C-alpha cells in the first residue's frame, strides 16, 4: 500500500488551496473528477496520477505535463458539492450550492486553443441546465443502467430525473430535514436516502410504462442520537447488493457506521472505529474470494461483536449462506482518519490516523479496486494504491453480476414481490419453454392453410366435408409460357370456370395434390371441434392453392388490424352449433356496448376534467401557477398570515389517484414565525384565498371541491363538492365568492355557515352580440366582481366599462348605469 500526497493535485489559485467537497472516478477508470469551494470542476487522468506511485526512475521525462488536469470547468456560480459520472461514461452530473444541476458531455475531437490561454486536453460542454432545487444540492446518484438520476439537497427534497432526456419525473418531500446522501441498489430495485431527520428511507421503483415509486422501509434506530454537524451523509451499497453502509450512526455514545441488511433491513451490525462522526462510506466495486484463514467466529459484516447469542447465531448463518465472497469498505469523517474494513473481519484491515488536517468529505474507488481517492477540507486530494492481492483475491466482474441474480438484476419484477422462490420457479419454467421459431412479420400475421388467420370468416355450416389438402414443397422451374389449354374446373352450380394458376410457381403446371387422412391434422386442433371448411377448399384437387391465404379484408389489414362491426351478418345461422351461437351472442353484446359517435371531443367528460381550466372569461384569473411551492397571504404586517401550498403532482397528472395518494398536496400555514396549520389533501389545489374577517382559508381543487380551513388547522365545514373547476376566489367581509370556468357564481356566508347564492350564470351579460352563423363570439370579459355593502348583492364589472347587479328577488341581472330592460338569466 502506498499513500500519495501530490502537492499539485489540488484546487489552487494563487497561494490558496480551496476546500474540496467531492470526488468521483469514471466507470472505465480513466478519469477522476473533483469539485470544491472555488466553483470549478477539474478532471484528471487516473493513469497519469498513478504513474507517481511507481519508483522515480520509471517516471516519464516530461512529468510536468502530467501534473495538469485534463479539463477545468467553471460554469457554477457557487461551490461544487456533488459530482457523479454516469455508469455509461457519457455524462457527468454536477450539483452546487447555487441550486443548479448541470449535465456535462465530453466533446469529441481536438480542441481549438483560444488566444494565448492554456488549452485543456479535453473539452466538456453543458448539455442541460436543470433548475428544481430550492437550496444546496448535497448528493447525486445514477441508476446502474443510467436510466434514472436522483438528486437530494438541503431543501428536504428528493428529485428524480430521466437519465436520457433529463426531464423531471418526480419530486418527493418526505424528509423533515436536510437530505445529505443518496445511493442506488446495484440490482436496480431500490435507492436509499439519508437525512438530518435521523432516518434512512429506502425507495422501491418499478420500470413499466410509467415509473412508480414506493417507500419500502424507513430505518431510524441507529441514527436516533446521531449529531447534525456533518456536511454529508454519503452512504454506499455493497456490489453484491446485500448491505448498505450509512455513516454518522451511533451505538450508544460511540460514533459508528451502520450496516443495513437487504430484505429485512436489519441494523444490528455497526462498524466501530472512529472517534468523531463519519461523513462518508464507500464500498470497493470489486468482490473478493472469501479467506478461510480468518477466525470463523467473527461476523461477516465486519462489525463490532454483539453480546447477544441471537446476533452471533445470525452472523454464523450469514457465513454459511453467503456465496463465499468478501466485500471491502472504506470509511472516513471528521476525525481525519481513514479505516478500511472487510466483511470477513471484525476489525479493520488498516486504519490511517491524521491522514488529513481537516475533515474528510468524499471517497471514490477506481473500477479495478486497486486505488482510492480521498478529498478533505484542507484542499488535498490523497491517493492510496494497493498491491495486487493486498485486499484479497478479486473475483471476475462476471461473477459480480451472478451475485445479483438472486435479486433479479436481469428481470423486472413488476407485479410480484421479490423472493428467491419466485426466481427459482422462473428458471425452471424457462427450461420447459418451447424454442422460439423465427418468422417474418407477414407470415406470422397471414397464417397457413393448416392454421387460418383469425381475420378469415368461418362458415357456420359446411355442406361438403372435405379433408384438408396438403401441398408438398416443390422447386419452381424456370419461367416460361405455359403451353396447352388452360385448366378448366366445374364448380357446384354446374358452370365452368378457368382455374387460376399459382403465382409462386410462375407458368408451370399445377402440382399434384395429395390428400392426407384426418389424423394428420395439426395437433393444435386436436382438442377442438373440427373446423368447418370453406367451399373453395372443395376444389383443392382442381385449383392450385396459395401457400398462404390472404385475409378477406385485404393485405393492408396485416399491418393494421380492422375490427369488424356486426360481423355476424357474414355467417349463416347454424342451429346445431351451440358454440357458434355463443360466439355470435358475445359479438352482439360487444356491438351494443360500443360508445356512440361523439361530435364534439371538447365536451367529453375526460377532456373537460383533464384540460387546464378555461380562463377566457376573466381578465385577471385567480388560478395559482403550476409550481412546486405557491405562497398565499392575507392581513397586514402586524398580523400577517401565510399559506404555503405544495402540490404533490404536476397538473398533467392531477387526476392520477394513485400518484395523489402517494404524494398528496401539502398545506402549511404560518403566523408570526410559527407553524399553525398542516394538512394533506389527495387533490391538486388550483385556487386559494384568505379571509381576514373570518380568519380562515378557502382552497379550490381541480376536481371541483372546496375546502375551508381555520387558521389553526381545523376544517370549518365538510368538503364542498361543486362539480366545477373554480378559477377565482374572492373573500369579501364574511362572504366567499367562487367563479367557475363554466361562468357560474357561488356565494357562501362563512360566519353563518350557509349558502347564499348558487349557480348564477353570467353568460347572459357576457354574450351581447348577435351570433353569426353557428359560432358565438364573446368580445367582453369580467374585470372584477364583489358584493354591495348595503344590499349584499353581487356586482360584476366588465372590461368595456359596463357593470351589472344580480337581483335576487327578480332572478336576473340589471344594468347599474342606465334604466335598460333587465337581462334575464
UniProtKB/Swiss-Prot annotation:
CDD domains: WD40. It comes from Eremothecium gossypii (strain ATCC 10895 / CBS 109.51 / FGSC 9923 / NRRL Y-1056) (Yeast). The keyword Protein biosynthesis does not apply. InterPro entries: CAF1B_HIR1_beta-prop, HIR1-like, HIRA-like_C, HIRA_B_motif, Intein_N, WD40/YVTN_repeat-like_dom_sf, WD40_repeat_dom_sf, WD40_rpt. GO terms for biological process: chromatin remodeling; intein-mediated protein splicing; negative regulation of chromatin organization; negative regulation of transcription by RNA polymerase II; negative regulation of transcription by RNA polymerase III; nucleosome assembly; transcription elongation by RNA polymerase II. This is Protein HIR1. Residues 294-320, 574-595 are annotated as: Disordered. Its main location: nucleus. GO terms for cellular component: chromatin; chromosome, centromeric region; HIR complex; nucleus. Residues 574-591 have a biased composition (Acidic residues). Required for replication-independent chromatin assembly and for the periodic repression of histone gene transcription during the cell cycle. The keyword Repressor applies. It is found in: Nucleus. Belongs to the WD repeat HIR1 family. Gene3D superfamilies: YVTN repeat-like/Quinoprotein amine dehydrogenase (2.130.10.10). WD repeats lie at residues 15-54, 75-114, 132-171, 174-213, 227-270, 309-351, 355-396. Keywords: Chromatin regulator, Nucleus, Repeat, Repressor, Transcription, Transcription regulation, WD repeat. Residues 294-304 have a biased composition (Basic and acidic residues). GO terms for molecular function: DNA binding; identical protein binding; nucleosome binding; transcription corepressor activity.
Amino acid at each position: 500500500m502506498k499513500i500519495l500526497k501530490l502537492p499539485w493535485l489540488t484546487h489552487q489559485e494563487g497561494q490558496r488551496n480551496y476546500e474540496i467537497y467531492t470526488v468521483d472516478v469514471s466507470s472505465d477508470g480513466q478519469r477522476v473528477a473533483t469539485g470544491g469551494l472555488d466553483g470549478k470542476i477539474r478532471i484528471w487522468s487516473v493513469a497519469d496520477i498513478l504513474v507517481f506511485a511507481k519508483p522515480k526512475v520509471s517516471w516519464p521525462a516530461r512529468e510536468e505535463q502530467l501534473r495538469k488536469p485534463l479539463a477545468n470547468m467553471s460554469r457554477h456560480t457557487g461551490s461544487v458539492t456533488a459530482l457523479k459520472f454516469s455508469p455509461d461514461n457519457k455524462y457527468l452530473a454536477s450539483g452546487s450550492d447555487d441550486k443548479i444541476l448541470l449535465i456535462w458531455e465530453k466533446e469529441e475531437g481536438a480542441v481549438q486553443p483560444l488566444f494565448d490561454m492554456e488549452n485543456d486536453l479535453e473539452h466538456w460542454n453543458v448539455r442541460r441546465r436543470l433548475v428544481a432545487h430550492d437550496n444546496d444540492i448535497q448528493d447525486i446518484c445514477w441508476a446502474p443502467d443510467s436510466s434514472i438520476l436522483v438528486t437530494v439537497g438541503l431543501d428536504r427534497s428528493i428529485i428524480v430525473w430521466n437519465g436520457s432526456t433529463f426531464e423531471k419525473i418526480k419530486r418527493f418531500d418526505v424528509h423533515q430535514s436536510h437530505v445529505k446522501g443518496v445511493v442506488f441498489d446495484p440490482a436496480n430495485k431500490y435507492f436509499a436516502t439519508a437525512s438530518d431527520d435521523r432516518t434512512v428511507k429506502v425507495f422501491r421503483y418499478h420500470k413499466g410504462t410509467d415509473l412508480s415509486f414506493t417507500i419500502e422501509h424507513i430505518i431510524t434506530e441507529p441514527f436516533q442520537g446521531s449529531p447534525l454537524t456533518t456536511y454529508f451523509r454519503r452512504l454506499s451499497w455493497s456490489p453484491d447488493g446485500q448491505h448498505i453502509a450509512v455513516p454518522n450512526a451511533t451505538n450508544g455514545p460511540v460514533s459508528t457506521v451502520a450496516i443495513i441488511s437487504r430484505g429485512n433491513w436489519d441494523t444490528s451490525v455497526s462498524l466501530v472505529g472512529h472517534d468523531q462522526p463519519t461523513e462518508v462510506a464507500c464500498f470497493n466495486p470489486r468482490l473478493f474470494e472469501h479467506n478461510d484463514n480468518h477466525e470463523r467466529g467473527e461476523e461477516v459484516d465486519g462489525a463490532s461483536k454483539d453480546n447477544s447469542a441471537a446476533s452471533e447465531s445470525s452472523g454464523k448463518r450469514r457465513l454459511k449462506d453467503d456465496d463465499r465472497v468478501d466485500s471491502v469498505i472504506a470509511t472516513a469523517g471528521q476525525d481525519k482518519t481513514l479505516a478500511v474494513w472487510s466483511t470477513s473481519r471484525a476489525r479493520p484491515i488498516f486504519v490511517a490516523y491524521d491522514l488529513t488536517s481537516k475533515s474528510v468529505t468524499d471517497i471514490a474507488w477506481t473500477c479495478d479496486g486497486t486505488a482510492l481517492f480521498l478529498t478533505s477540507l484542507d484542499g488535498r486530494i490523497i491517493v492510496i494504491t494497493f498491491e495486487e492481492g493486498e485486499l484479497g483475491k478479486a473475483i471476475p466482474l462476471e461473477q459480480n453480476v451472478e451475485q445479483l441474480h438472486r435479486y433479479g438484476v436481469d428481470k423486472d419484477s413488476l407485479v410480484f414481490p421479490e423472493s428467491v422462490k419466485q426466481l427459482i420457479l422462473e428458471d425452471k419454467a424457462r427450461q420447459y419453454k418451447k424454442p422460439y421459431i423465427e418468422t417474418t412479420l407477414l407470415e406470422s400475421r397471414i397464417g397457413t392453410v393448416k392454421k387460418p388467420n383469425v381475420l378469415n370468416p368461418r362458415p357456420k355450416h359446411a355442406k361438403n366435408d372435405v379433408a384438408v389438402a396438403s401441398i408438398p414443397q416443390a422447386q419452381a422451374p424456370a419461367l416460361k409460357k405455359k403451353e396447352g389449354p388452360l385448366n378448366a374446373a366445374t364448380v357446384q352450380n354446374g358452370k365452368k370456370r378457368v382455374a387460376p394458376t399459382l403465382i409462386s410457381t410462375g407458368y408451370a403446371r399445377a402440382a399434384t395434390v395429395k390428400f392426407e387422412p384426418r389424423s394428420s391434422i395439426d395437433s393444435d386442433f386436436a382438442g377442438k371441434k373440427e373446423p368447418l371448411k370453406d367451399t373453395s377448399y372443395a376444389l383443392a384437387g382442381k385449383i392450385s392453392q396459395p401457400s398462404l391465404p390472404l385475409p378477406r379484408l385485404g393485405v393492408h389489414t396485416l399491418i393494421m388490424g380492422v375490427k369488424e362491426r356486426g360481423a355476424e351478418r357474414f355467417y349463416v345461422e347454424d342451429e346445431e352449433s351451440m358454440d357458434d351461437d355463443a360466439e355470435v351472442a358475445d359479438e352482439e353484446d360487444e356491438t351494443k356496448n360500443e360508445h356512440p359517435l361523439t361530435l364534439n371531443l371538447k365536451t367529453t367528460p375526460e377532456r373537460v376534467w383533464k384540460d387546464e381550466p378555461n380562463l377566457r372569461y376573466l381578465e385577471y384569473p385567480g388560478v395559482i401557477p403550476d409550481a412546486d411551492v405557491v405562497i398565499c397571504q392575507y392581513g397586514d404586517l402586524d398580523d400577517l398570515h401565510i399559506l404555503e401550498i405544495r402540490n404533490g403532482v404536476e397538473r398533467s397528472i392531477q387526476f392520477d389517484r394513485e400518484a395523489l395518494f402517494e404524494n398528496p398536496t401539502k398545506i402549511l400555514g404560518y403566523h408570526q414565525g410559527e407553524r399553525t396549520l398542516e394538512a394533506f389533501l389527495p387533490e391538486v389545489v388550483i385556487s386559494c384565498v384568505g379571509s381576514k374577517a373570518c380568519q380562515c382559508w378557502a382552497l379550490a381543487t381541480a376536481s371541483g371541491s372546496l375546502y375551508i380551513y381555520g387558521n389553526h388547522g381545523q376544517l370549518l365545514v365538510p368538503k364542498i363538492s361543486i362539480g366545477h373547476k373554480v378559477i377565482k376566489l374572492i373573500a369579501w367581509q364574511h362572504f366567499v365568492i367562487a367563479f367557475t370556468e363554466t361562468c357560474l357564481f357561488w356565494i357562501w356566508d362563512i360566519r353563518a355557515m350557509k349558502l347564499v347564492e348558487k349557480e348564477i350564470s353570467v353568460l347572459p351579460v357576457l354574450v351581447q352580440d348577435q351570433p353569426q352563423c353557428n359560432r358565438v363570439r364573446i368580445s367582453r370579459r369580467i374585470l372584477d366582481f364583489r358584493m354591495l355593502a348595503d344590499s349584499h348583492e353581487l356586482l360584476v364589472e366588465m372590461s368595456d366599462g359596463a357593470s351589472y347587479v344580480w337581483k335576487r328577488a327578480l332572478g336576473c341581472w340589471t344594468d347599474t348605469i342606465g334604466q335598460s330592460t333587465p337581462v334575464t338569466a
